[in-house]
Amino acid sequence: MRKLLVAALISLGATGAFAEGSGVPDTDGPNLTLEVGGSVTGKVVIDLLPDVAPKHVAQIVALAGEGAYDDVVFHRVIDGFMAQTGDVQFGKRGGETRMAGMGGSHLPDLPAEFSNRSFVRGMVGMARSSDPNSANSQFFIMFDAAPHLDGQYTIVGHVIEGMEIVDQLKKGNPAANGLVEDPDYIVHATVE
């Protein structure tokens, strides 16, 4: 009986304890849930990592709580690399989305919180300018591993549900650095 119980626990742990696609153990959250709309609809759940990037996670939680991420487009989506969103200043649907990727929020830019974690499939990082201390509201979700980003960008979480939705996001033009025409978007973002 004990062996059966151990086998069941190991089986349960193998299926439920790791983030979808990233191979990173799920933590206690908080979780950022993105309701996605556009050419693909569904839910993406990101396990945020306050132990890795406390200031960045706090800023994401605050912005989601204000509704700032609602109606923000996935403005830059590069097949095999990543999908970027979160420009709450210029990335709102119906606005000047051609400027998406250049804005932030009313909150201050954040100092880098680099870690020894790796950018693998499903990992979520903060977008920034060439200044490592310029991350604000924008973030990206990895389609595949990108070791050249390790230690250069702040990791804030990993996808634990809905990676198939991320995979189906409308891709951008590679010649235009992944800029997406008529992009998919975040209908509503919540944190639990």
Where are these regions (language model features)?
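Cyclophilin-like peptidyl-prolyl cis-trans isomerases
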Residues: G16-E192
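Positively charged n-region of N-terminal signal peptides that target proteins for export
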Residues: M1-L4
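Bacterial N-terminal signal peptides
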Residues: V6-G13
